[in-house]
């Protein structure tokens, strides 16, 4: 499975890239600047393979300009701030094609327009994920996920104590992304229903940021009380 991470040089994108590369997935770091993407990929290879004494393999972890990164990927993960989401989707749209899955991790925080990171903006389409779906070519499945994962926890060794809520109108695509989420140690994946439910999941992120600011922590979300099969473990 090849995964292009758009915004892969940022904290969230690089953290997801690190975890999936450790799980043996082929990861392509996307950036506006190909050189920056290549440098980020080199650092990631050193983290993943250096400590274990395994030679770096460019074919497993590589870097490319965002549009180029999308062209050969089965799954495209968008990890850019809300203010950059629409522009980025318009940029990569020509490189997206039917059969791909676009995973949107965007949270419409008020900080994107100079407001507080503990508040969300209203999105005309209902959610950032629904806005992404509107800007995505026909035949590309849009899945909303990974909104509530702390970027800091992704970069720390050890399991991530957090559940990932996955929302999509395409059940098969959602199932694939839940399986991908489970490759991160400690993470459970929960079916969040249709894409419109992403609005609720996105709002939770602002609440978690508030917890983190007040407590100087890295809070996550756990869904309890469901039967074991609901967590896709």
Predicted regions and their residues:
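Short beta-strand and adjoining strand-loop segment in the mid-core
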Residues: 115-125, 156-172
């Amino acid at each position: 499975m090849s995964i292009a991470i758009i915004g892969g040089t940022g904290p969230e994108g690089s953290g997801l890239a690190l975890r999936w590369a450790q799980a043996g997935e082929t990861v392509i770091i996307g950036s506006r600047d190909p050189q920056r993407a290549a440098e980020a990929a080199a650092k990631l290879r050193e983290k993943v393979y250096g400590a274990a004494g395994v030679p770096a393999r460019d074919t497993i972890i590589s870097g490319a300009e965002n549009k180029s990164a999308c062209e050969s990927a089965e799954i495209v993960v968008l990890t850019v701030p809300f203010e950059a989401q629409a522009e980025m989707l318009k940029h990569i749209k020509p490189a997206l094609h039917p059969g791909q899955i676009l995973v949107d991790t965007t949270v419409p925080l008020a900080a994107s327009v100079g407001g507080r990171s503990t508040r969300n903006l209203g999105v005309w389409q209902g959610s950032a994920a629904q806005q992404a779906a509107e800007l995505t070519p026909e035949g590309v499945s849009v899945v909303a996920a990974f909104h509530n994962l702390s970027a800091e926890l992704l970069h720390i060794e050890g399991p991530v104590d957090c559940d990932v809520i996955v929302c999509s109108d395409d059940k098969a695509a959602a199932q694939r992304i839940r399986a991908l989420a489970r490759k991160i140690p400690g993470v459970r994946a929960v079916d969040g229903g249709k894409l419109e439910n992403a609005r609720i999941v996105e709002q939770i992120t602002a609440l978690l940021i508030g917890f983190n600011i007040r407590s100087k922590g890295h809070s996550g979300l756990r869904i309890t009380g469901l039967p074991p099969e609901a967590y896709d473990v």
